[in-house]
Swiss-Prot record:
It comes from Shewanella sp. (strain ANA-3). The keyword Magnesium does not apply. GO terms for cellular component: cytoplasm; plasma membrane. Its EC number is 1.3.5.2. It comes from the Bacteria. This is Dihydroorotate dehydrogenase (quinone). Its cofactor is FMN.
Length: 339
């Protein structure tokens, strides 16, 4: 009930202003009695993933809490993990406003945020400051002004700094809103990046005496052959996990709606079938050797179950969470427990 009232107010506001207000409010209330307005008890449904044990298989996707400011509040809601970021080595403002658009009839969102964040050093401070022991993945990317050919260096900088504080690290090469970024998903550029990250991971594991898994987040706008090539590269470089998928550049299911022609990545219900299809193809290519987090268009427990059936071990929500509220977490966990 509280979420429906809050949502009604928020949906009257500019989307980015509403987002910033929500994150600020959650930051202030995460460890206070006021978190009773959104906290919920969810019975454990433990799941093993990348050598880690999560309390349940439902996580918050990257992009909601870019700077890790409201981690404790999301823990109170019952998420099994939170993925913060995308974070870059240096702070950057992102793309020009407006850059976030609701397509309410389709339960969808278009964004062209452009990795706006306060930088990796600020994120590390927030990771240290969190009060709860929730599993936190850190999604890392490159700065907009770093040439793609040197992008590897940005990922290594971020990895080095977040490694001691992350449950796992997600490598984002699939956002459509950073020029040239998606080119890292192909051929020699991909192999070179994954190899460098794996080498760095093993160095950091020795240095910090703990092994932090790394996962690759991929786009939905890939051919079957491209997905197979990515799968082979992940296996070859001994990556620990994959996350499928990011937002799509297609506009299937939103034609004619207000804001449908805005540039950027489309998320939400129109992405449901495409992301599930990619998960299934990726799972085939990985052949059980590397586990997958399924994300994209999960608007109900049934959508999540389809991701599990396609080959995902865990799922993440974002747009569906905005449209449905925290109850979606509980619904998915309960359905998972019964499946």
């Amino acid at each position: 009930m509280f979420y429906k009232i809050a949502q009604k107010v928020m949906f009257q506001m500019d989307p980015e202003r509403a987002h910033n207000l929500a994150i600020g409010s959650l930051k202030m209330t995460g460890n206070s009695p006021l978190n009773a307005f959104y906290a919920q008890n969810i019975a454990p449904a433990p799941v093993s993933f990348m050598g880690l044990t999560f309390p349940n298989p439902v996580g918050l996707a990257a992009g909601m809490d870019k700077d890790g400011e409201s981690i404790d509040a999301f823990h109170a809601m019952g998420f099994g993990h939170v993925e913060v970021g995308t974070v870059t080595p240096r702070p950057q403002p992102g793309n020009d406003l407006p850059r976030l658009f609701r397509l309410k009839p389709a339960k969808a969102i278009i964004n062209r945020m452009g990795f706006n964040n306060k930088g990796v050093d600020n994120l590390v401070k927030n990771l240290i400051a969190k009060k709860t022991d929730i599993m936190v993945g850190v999604n890392i990317g490159k700065n907009k002004d770093t040439p793609v050919e040197q992008g590897k260096d940005d990922y290594l900088i971020c990895m080095d700094k977040v490694y001691p504080y992350a449950a796992y690290i997600a490598v984002n090469i699939s956002s459509p809103n950073t020029p040239g970024l998606r080119s890292l998903q192909y051929g020699d550029l991909l192999d070179e990046l994954l190899s460098a990250l794996k080498t760095k991971q093993l160095e950091l594991a020795e240095k910090h005496k703990k092994y932090v898994p790394i996962a690759l987040k991929i786009a939905p706008d890939l051919t079957t052959e491209e997905i197979e090539n990515i799968a082979q590269s992940l296996i070859k470089n001994k990556f620990d996990g994959a996350i499928a998928t990011n937002t799509t550049l297609t506009r299937d299911g939103v034609s004619g709606l207000a804001n449908a022609n805005e540039s950027g990545g489309l998320s939400g219900k129109p992405l449901t079938e495409l992301s599930t299809k990619v998960i299934k193809q990726l799972a085939t290519g990985l052949n059980g050797q590397i586990p997958i987090i399924g994300v994209g268009g999960i608007n109900s427990a049934e959508d999540a179950l389809a991701k599990f059936d396609a080959g995902a071990t865990m799922v993440q929500i974002y747009s569906g969470f905005i449209y449905q509220g925290p109850k979606l977490i509980k619904e998915i966990v309960e359905a998972y427990r019964l499946k």
